[in-house]
Amino acid sequence: MRYFTAGESHGPRLTAIIEGVPAGLPLTADYINAELRRRQGGYGRGGRMKIESDQVEITSGVRHGLTMGSPITLNVTNRDFKNWTEIMSAADIEDKKKSIRKLTKPRPGHADLVGGMKYRFSDLRNSLERSSARETTMRVAVGSVAKRLLEELEITIASHVVVLGGIEVDVPENLTVAEIKERASQSEISVVNQEHEQEIKDYIDQIKKEGNTIGGIIETVVGGVPVGLGSYVQWDRKLDAQIAQGVVSINAFKGVEFGLGFKDGYLKGSYVMDEITWSKEDGYRRKSNNLGGFEGGMTNGQPIVVRGVMKPIPTLYKPLMSVDIETHEPYKASVERSDPTAVPAAAVVMEGVVATVLATEILNKFSSDNMEELKEAVKSHQKFIKEF
């Protein structure tokens, strides 16, 4: 399975084309829209979310609620485009109009300046429009298709916020994926411990008044994953590496870890490694899950536990200093519509990205043209693993 996305933040629409989804997967626009609503929610979201009410249109690859095995095309209209029709026009317009909303004061931490240098733009809006987090709308849409496939294989996935603005959430031990999903869904900031809810929301309000932004850390957990996804035989076939690439490809994400992650650097091997057990009923298991469900770049049957860190949003309402690319004079950076934080919403994006990587690897290992064949292949593999 592979996909491409297209579209600008203030253009007419966003598009994704997905290839390789087996025929016979139940899929509806309502299911995708529910995921898009999750992305638009979360405490701390700003004005753009009041303008946009994302609704997907499926224009190919699905008929009568079932995928057809052909490329799936998803479109989401940008409602705000009506205010940007000339500014974002594909057709040439007069120079006077081109100067409207021209961006020449790049924002520190954003793609504005480097994108302008790379593609030789005199108007840095060209960098801003495609590099905007608005593109994550389609990452969620694509991820919802992947999640639908995982559900059919009884693979569950959930995400929650574990750190927001430096405030750490006390996460109860041994929560199931279903419990994480339920608890996070009841929180405006996607935390599983309500004791932190008001403290974090108050801090978000404070940050907004300051004209500042905050980042955080998100954890995604996947249960029911078959043993042996990924491979050790080549570097690029290691599944944890593929997930790491996917997570860090999300706008503003700067790091990723699995299981104990960076704590491994402070611990002894006798503590970190997960001891192996065997029983006739369950086959091979691990006593712990310090490695986050991976050994040798392959899934080992334990839940996948992956965390990603998101930096604070670079657009500040009290902007930092920058330089005008036309005059080379120091100026405060440009201000675009922004939020004090998007970490809760980014949890939905990360969940979709991890689901997409997993679905892709499943289809690589259990290559199937239709869902019936796929389910049979996975079931046969699971039987072999249990009897190994």
From Swiss-Prot:
Enzyme class, first EC level, given as a word: lyase
PANTHER family in UniProt: CHORISMATE SYNTHASE
UniProt binding sites for FMN: 130-132, 251-252, 296, 311-315, 337
Annotated GO biological process: amino acid biosynthetic process; aromatic amino acid family biosynthetic process; chorismate biosynthetic process
Molecular functions (GO terms): chorismate synthase activity; FMN binding
Signal peptide region: none
Pathway assignment: Metabolic intermediate biosynthesis; chorismate biosynthesis; chorismate from D-erythrose 4-phosphate and phosphoenolpyruvate: step 7/7
InterPro entries in the cross-refs: Chorismate_synth, Chorismate_synth_AroC_sf, Chorismate_synthase_CS
Subunit organization: Homotetramer.
A Pfam entry, by short name: Chorismate_synt
PROSITE patterns in UniProt: CHORISMATE_SYNTHASE_1, CHORISMATE_SYNTHASE_2, CHORISMATE_SYNTHASE_3
This protein's name: Chorismate synthase
Catalytic reactions of this protein: 5-O-(1-carboxyvinyl)-3-phosphoshikimate = chorismate + phosphate
UniProt entry tagged with the keyword Kinase: no
Organism per entry: Streptococcus mutans serotype c (strain ATCC 700610 / UA159)
Gene3D superfamilies assigned: Chorismate synthase AroC (3.60.150.10)
Keywords: Amino-acid biosynthesis, Aromatic amino acid biosynthesis, FAD, Flavoprotein, FMN, Lyase, NADP
